């Protein structure tokens, strides 16, 4: 049975899963979810994701939600497909896991808030909360200072090769690079180079094309 991703093309979480599938050379069907009408908060969608968020994922009889859990499933179950997104070395895997936690717990809260305020709200006709932007930018800057130090030690956050750690960052960075927050990334040379590297990955470019069809 075909892999299905139920989600919205504008959703960073949907983008994250799509990019992972394309990195692994896996075909999938994108099943659009109309979030404007609230489809994600109603049945039958709630049978796929009881929290009413996107995406939801189906691989045969298996149903998953939470984008980072989905990408980890894909990377492990389809380890022999496409690009290797996880580190097999038992001494390197914990380092990758640490930085995956950092992305989810330290980067995501501030980056996603900025994406919402500066990237999504203008598209859907909502007013940006300038105070929220200012506070989130300050907090994101602190995280990126740590990233700048980390990237002096290795080419990517999880180690010397591109992994899920880096992939998980891409959707928010993609949105923020077209906003005034771009300067927060560009002012840190190693962070700026890392962003350019991961945004140029063919799988990400292909994923955007698929989502925007």
From Swiss-Prot:
Top-level lineage group: Eukaryota
Single GO molecular function: glutathione transferase activity
Domain GST C-terminal, chain residue ranges per copy: 89-213
Catalytic activity: RX + glutathione = an S-substituted glutathione + a halide anion + H(+)
Ligand binding (glutathione): 11-13, 40-41, 53-54, 66-67
Pfam families, sorted: GST_C, GST_N
E.C. no: 2.5.1.18
Gene3D superfamilies: 1.20.1050.10, Glutaredoxin (3.40.30.10)
Keyword Transferase among record annotations: yes
GO CC aspect terms: cytoplasm
Chain's role: Conjugation of reduced glutathione to a wide number of exogenous and endogenous hydrophobic electrophiles.
Similarity comment: family membership: Belongs to the GST superfamily. Phi family.
Protein name according to UniProt: Glutathione S-transferase APIC
Organism: Nicotiana tabacum (Common tobacco)
Gene this chain is encoded by: APIC
